[in-house]
């Protein structure tokens, strides 16, 4: 696993009802991009030093933005379908 400042650390939820946890990598403690990373967690704004486990992935800011846009599109499509089903 390699990362750079500005990448996102995503910890996958263990089950379908658990959301992913996402944090912005604000410091990389090694010269080669390997862990540990200093991460600011999105949900809590808490800053912690993290050595990621096997349930973690590093994504670039561009990849995260694309994933966010896909999620917004899916949400909009579901919302539109609900409104259409209601007849409004």
Swiss-Prot record:
What switches on expression, per the entry, is described as: A member of the dormancy regulon. Induced in response to reduced oxygen tension (hypoxia), low levels of nitric oxide (NO) and carbon monoxide (CO). It is hoped that this regulon will give insight into the latent, or dormant phase of infection.
Instruction: State the GO CC annotations.
Output: cytosol; peptidoglycan-based cell wall
Give the UniProt record's GO annotations in the biological process aspect. Answer: response to hypoxia
One Pfam family this sequence matches:
DUF1918
Record InterPro entries: DUF1918
Instruction: Write down what this protein is called.
Output: Uncharacterized protein Rv0569
